[in-house]
Amino acid sequence: MSCPVIELTQQLIRRPSLSPYDAGCQALLIERLQAIGFTVERMDFADTQNFWAWRGQGETLAFAGHTDVVPPGDADRWINPPFEPTIRDGMLFGRGAADMKGSLAAMVVAAERFVAQHPNHTGRLAFLITSDEEASAHNGTVKVVEALMARNERLDYCLVGEPSSIEVVGDVVKNGRRGSLTCNLTIHGVQGHVAYPHLADNPVHRAAPFLNELVAIEWDQGNEFFPATSMQIANIQAGTGSNNVIPGELFVQFNFRFSTELTDEMIKAQVLALLEKHQLRYTVDWWLSGQPFLTARGKLVDAVVNAVEHYNEIKPQLLTTGGTSDGRFIARMGAQVVELGPVNATIHKINECVNAADLQLLARMYQRIMEQLVA
């Protein structure tokens, strides 16, 4: 199958860019963008490679994505080696095919076609690419955004190429994401012998009523755009492994995926009040991974919906479900942010794959979005 989108996707898959290492992917993208007149600024931080590229001036539409991938797992369980792209029955297999090297290829090819047809486009077309999205995300998009904001860089619209679709390309478009807040909580007791409980203080017993009340809380009911806030306990650890020792500490880690009905400070206050109510001795550490954001109907959402309807003849759902994405950082710039990418059924799995025809379709959608916003 000869198609510039498929060929570029295959070239990217062959580069084993395990997060946060880029493995030469960005050099390939930069070469293609510079060839059509983009100015490229590398913005590397620690072991992470990033670049910001732009062409033209004025109202700015950026395409954002990541070159890094998650580990492939047991390579013997793949139908072909994970970094050797293979097409079978119209499906392109390889780590990163759907998340998100296919999107990157579609973006670049769309830009090439757009520039060829609109060499003097009236707005500015940009790319924000990182190699640190799948791992810590500490030195990736967030650092680039901070640098761009420090110099008052303009960003009006941003399309993130995350695999948003469920069954066919464009059936779901993400126009926002929930916030993510993690609590690392240690309940302190007194270690002792299980035969002498009066000489100890069991933190597991102490914490049980608190945890029961915590999991029963209805945090909110969501709203028109967001599902209700959810809280899930992810890890609990206590004890020495011995059956005759009362533990001295209990560690509990729980995560909130929260809507715009709450702030992280509201959640923290409610948890701390509950700890005090149960008279627990504790230490607590919070990690805010991202605030919730929402892009209401406007020029970007309308352009994306138009592109999907034009090429796939379906009306996309606008959803905010799922995990976090780098869109949470880009939204800080005041930009309208939307995610549109391929079907996500196999992301992070053994035998990750994407319909090759979907990538060709995605490139056409991306080009139509460019034409509506910056031509």
UniProtKB/Swiss-Prot annotation:
The active site is at 68, 133 (proton acceptor). One of its GO terms (molecular function) is zinc ion binding. It comes from the Bacteria. Zn(2+) 1 binds at residues 66, 99, 162. The keyword Amino-acid biosynthesis applies. Binds 2 Zn(2+) or Co(2+) ions per subunit. Keywords: Amino-acid biosynthesis, Cobalt, Diaminopimelate biosynthesis, Hydrolase, Lysine biosynthesis, Metal-binding, Zinc. InterPro entries: ArgE/DapE_CS, Bact_exopeptidase_dim_dom, DapE_proteobac, Peptidase_M20, Peptidase_M20_dimer, Peptidase_M20A. Coiled coil: none annotated. Its EC number is 3.5.1.18. It catalyses: N-succinyl-(2S,6S)-2,6-diaminopimelate + H2O = (2S,6S)-2,6-diaminopimelate + succinate. GO terms for biological process: diaminopimelate biosynthetic process; L-arginine biosynthetic process; lysine biosynthetic process via diaminopimelate. Homodimer. Catalyzes the hydrolysis of N-succinyl-L,L-diaminopimelic acid (SDAP), forming succinate and LL-2,6-diaminopimelate (DAP), an intermediate involved in the bacterial biosynthesis of lysine and meso-diaminopimelic acid, an essential component of bacterial cell walls. Belongs to the peptidase M20A family. DapE subfamily. This is Succinyl-diaminopimelate desuccinylase. It comes from Shigella flexneri serotype 5b (strain 8401).
